[in-house]
Amino acid sequence: LGINGKVLRIFDKRTQQKFALKMLQDCPKARREVELHWRASQCPHIVDIVDVYENLYAGRKCLLIVMECLDGGELFSRIQDRGDQAFTEREASEIMKSIGEAIQYLHSINIAHRDVKPENLLYTSKRPNAILKLTDFGFAKETTSHNSLTTPCYTPYYVAPEVLGPEKYDKSCDMWSLGVIMYILLCGYPPFYSNHGLAISPGMKTRIRMGQYEFPNPEWSEVSEEVKMLIRNLLKTEPTQRMTITEFMNHPWIMQSTKVPQTPLHTSRVLKEDKERWEDVKEEMTSALATMRVDYEQIKIKKIEDASNPLLLKRRKKARAVEAAALAH
């Protein structure tokens, strides 16, 4: 039994109805996950918990969480598999509205999800009218004032800048993830990437922390400046400057999604062409998740004055020599 739990497909013998079963080793963390997920599952865009059982498995106490079965697959797989039919800006807007509704509900009841990423966004069925739902509350946390978030648990391509440094972070972490997902929806690739095929390289860390990304053509040539500005407001490196979920939901591109132009996007083609890389990215993210959830206590970033950077030492030495020479004259 893993700490984050394995999900199995099960069915009701009486009705033949399908469900998803998540097994968690019984511990305070697991109970917290179940409690927060249960509280949130009233939202139509969050996977519903049907029942929770305590049991013994291989002699260990465990929790069995019975949830609705989401048969429609992952968000980006669905866009990838759509054939020749172009994915449009209006569809991207409608998808972002659905995800926004889930986050809005969570934030309104003081819960931060902290792991909003495409793999945790699943459709209820393969039908065109299927509902997109947010899953996996393994890293969700209550965000009351006495309990600000201090544990980094993240997936490289969707990790907010403040998770990489020692600053505290809160609901704005989810907003940053929304920005990354929106960016991918509109072009088919992430705004931050590793040049070396590593899950999270030093260069990528720097780009994330500095908020360095572009809107390259041809993929972005037809996307309006208003939409790019919305992404910029979600990807702000300073959490306090980042858009809140209320501001996001009130933005015309989200609020009036039916009026958004049906501009064909490159997303589906790019995702198809990069299918192998996309799978690698997901694998990297999964393995990186296991290794990167470190306690903030272990992250100590030295002040620049105390840093023993050889380049800085060289510069300081040179500066002192220049100063000494000037004084001598």
From Swiss-Prot:
A motif (Bipartite nuclear localization signal 1) lies at residues 300-303. There is a cross-link at residue 282 (Glycyl lysine isopeptide (Lys-Gly) (interchain with G-Cter in SUMO)). Staurosporine binds at residues 68-70. The modification Phosphothreonine is found at residues 151, 263. Residues 1-254 form the Protein kinase domain. A motif (Nuclear export signal (NES)) lies at residues 285-294. Keywords: ATP-binding, Cytoplasm, DNA damage, Isopeptide bond, Kinase, Nucleotide-binding, Nucleus, Phosphoprotein, Serine/threonine-protein kinase, Transferase, Ubl conjugation. Its EC number is 2.7.11.1. Stress-activated serine/threonine-protein kinase involved in cytokine production, endocytosis, reorganization of the cytoskeleton, cell migration, cell cycle control, chromatin remodeling, DNA damage response and transcriptional regulation. Following stress, it is phosphorylated and activated by MAP kinase p38-alpha/MAPK14, leading to phosphorylation of substrates. Phosphorylates serine in the peptide sequence, Hyd-X-R-X(2)-S, where Hyd is a large hydrophobic residue. This is MAP kinase-activated protein kinase 2. It comes from Cricetulus longicaudatus (Long-tailed dwarf hamster).
